[in-house]
Amino acid sequence: MGRMHSKGKGIASSALPYVRSPPAWCKADADSVVEQILKFSKKGMSPSQIGVTLRDSHGIPQVRFITGQKIMRILKANGLAPELPEDLYNLIKKAVSVRKHLERNRKDKDSKFRLILIESRIHRLARYYRKVGALPPTWKYESATASALVA
């Protein structure tokens, strides 16, 4: 899939292993993995940060192969899922930081243009999440209240 606001084709990506069972060297059981996920979530980590931490520090290659569920589904089942989807949250955070930069540097035309691109991505993603039901139908992105969403 190509990039939205640039010329890149986006060919490179990591490939999941063909075998969908946990590898023989992985000794973790499903209950301990779920416990660790909930512990990290209570510390304030995002789902992708939880996955990276489990992979790098605890030797758990794929949570889904061990537990049978993705990290977000585990968090939703335990009531710890974030209110905003993670990709939308990260875009809003980026838009807030660019807007803050523009307050200090009013003549930065390139950042002004990039802010327009970021906000158009936010609107597109919000439209998708409203359609799917991950966001309420009345949810709307407003730049004035965006810093409160991220804080």
Swiss-Prot record:
GO biological process, one term: cytoplasmic translation
Subunit structure: Component of the small ribosomal subunit (SSU). Mature yeast ribosomes consist of a small (40S) and a large (60S) subunit. The 40S small subunit contains 1 molecule of ribosomal RNA (18S rRNA) and at least 33 different proteins. The large 60S subunit contains 3 rRNA molecules (25S, 5.8S and 5S rRNA) and at least 46 different proteins.
Residues where Phosphoserine is found: 21, 32
Entries under SMART domains matching the protein: Ribosomal_S13_N, Ribosomal_S15
Function description: Component of the ribosome, a large ribonucleoprotein complex responsible for the synthesis of proteins in the cell. The small ribosomal subunit (SSU) binds messenger RNAs (mRNAs) and translates the encoded message by selecting cognate aminoacyl-transfer RNA (tRNA) molecules. The large subunit (LSU) contains the ribosomal catalytic site termed the peptidyl transferase center (PTC), which catalyzes the formation of peptide bonds, thereby polymerizing the amino acids delivered by tRNAs into a polypeptide chain.
GO molecular function: small ribosomal subunit rRNA binding; structural constituent of ribosome
Source species, domain of life: Eukaryota
Main location group: cytoplasm
Subcellular location: Cytoplasm
Protein name (record): Small ribosomal subunit protein uS15
Keywords for the protein's UniProt record, in alphabetical order: Cytoplasm, Phosphoprotein, Ribonucleoprotein, Ribosomal protein
Organism per entry: Schizosaccharomyces pombe (strain 972 / ATCC 24843) (Fission yeast)
Single GO cellular component term: cytosolic small ribosomal subunit
CDD domains, alphabetized: Ribosomal_S15p_S13e
Family membership: Belongs to the universal ribosomal protein uS15 family.
The keyword Phosphoprotein is assigned to this record: yes
Keyword Transport: no
PANTHER family according to UniProt: RIBOSOMAL PROTEIN S15P/S13E, SMALL RIBOSOMAL SUBUNIT PROTEIN US15
